Curated annotation (Swiss-Prot):
Protein's UniProt name: Cytochrome b
Topology class, membrane: Multi-pass membrane protein
Species: Potorous tridactylus
CC per GO annotation: mitochondrial inner membrane; respiratory chain complex III
Complex and partners: The cytochrome bc1 complex contains 11 subunits: 3 respiratory subunits (MT-CYB, CYC1 and UQCRFS1), 2 core proteins (UQCRC1 and UQCRC2) and 6 low-molecular weight proteins (UQCRH/QCR6, UQCRB/QCR7, UQCRQ/QCR8, UQCR10/QCR9, UQCR11/QCR10 and a cleavage product of UQCRFS1). This cytochrome bc1 complex then forms a dimer.
Membrane spanning residue stretches: 33-53, 77-98, 113-133, 178-198, 226-246, 288-308, 320-340, 347-367
Swiss-Prot/TrEMBL cofactor(s): heme b
Gene: MT-CYB
Residues engaged in binding heme b b562: H83, H182
Other observations noted: Heme 1 (or BL or b562) is low-potential and absorbs at about 562 nm, and heme 2 (or BH or b566) is high-potential and absorbs at about 566 nm.
Cofactor: binding details: Binds 2 heme b groups non-covalently.
Amino acid sequence: MTNLRKTHPLIKIINHSFIDLPAPSNISAWWNFGSLLGICLIIQILTGLFLAMHYTSDTLTAFSSVAHICRDVNYGWLIRNLHANGASMFFMCLFLHVGRGIYYGSYLYKETWNIGVILLLTVMATAFVGYVLPWGQMSFWGATVITNLLSAIPYIGTTLVEWIWGGFSVDKATLTRFFAFHFILPFIIVALVVVHLLFLHETGSSNPSGINPDSDKIPFHPYYTIKDILGLMIMLLTLLALALFSPDMLGDPDNFSPASPLNTPPHIKPEWYFLFAYAILRSIPNKLGGVLALLASILILLLIPLLHTSKQRSLMFRPISQTLFWMLTADLITLPWIGGQPVEQPFIIIGQVASILYFSLIIILMPLAGLLENYMLKPKW
């Protein structure tokens, strides 16, 4: 069996990626999230496949087909709850994975980082089109509001929006194509994940200290397979607790009402994992400016490798940068809270301050802190 593992053309690739992979001996639980994201993706594809067997992408029957899945299909309620809450777990792991990358300087593996940002955007697109499918009130109005943002593009905006809608409003054509996108995008994500891993295994993983780990490597199996299984158990326990005890906690009550173009919900807001970007969008009183800020809030991640000024890779030995990183974390907890609040004072001003702080920390303050820490490293005698 050992020979087959090392000689068979297919099994050899798996062996080099998950079994005999040389891994740094000191990577912490923060390095668990890559494998957790892989498991999340598998769960989402499998539950999504079973939901697609019973779902109909027609405006007249979409809402009732979801109700039918929950009431009449064997364990349909469980599959749907796992799929809906699985998305929340996916994004939770994604945000922690990106945060780990920023804290420990993983972004200096530029190819891996850039593919990761593309993956983040693709997952966000998949989640957005997926949220439209149950055809509840928030599905319909969320689709209307977010697709309408494209009309802010000068000259071609209105044409572009109508092209995406497939008509003059969000209707049957929109729902059908969103279902098609929601079905195909996860497979594109799988392909991107393979490329992400390919680039990662070119360089190997970084580690908390930020120094070259080549002199001290251990095989991935059994050490990190066991460690990842612990993280997996914790994640699955959390997901099952959510799906079985409070499946609707993270959803919007408005989505229990069928979509009606004649009835606007009092507060249109996306799922919690988009609220940080939604808060930044709303904090700018100009439509085009808001759309650009929304895009910048995610695309700014592509600039992070270029803004690295420190002589050290990780934040482990950089107290000033650590303080700024945790300020950024606090800011990214404040923004979703603001995104879920009505547009009135004092939430407007808090959102604007939080948005300015978000961009300032990444573009100005953290690079300056890196330079200051470099200066403090120099001997003064």
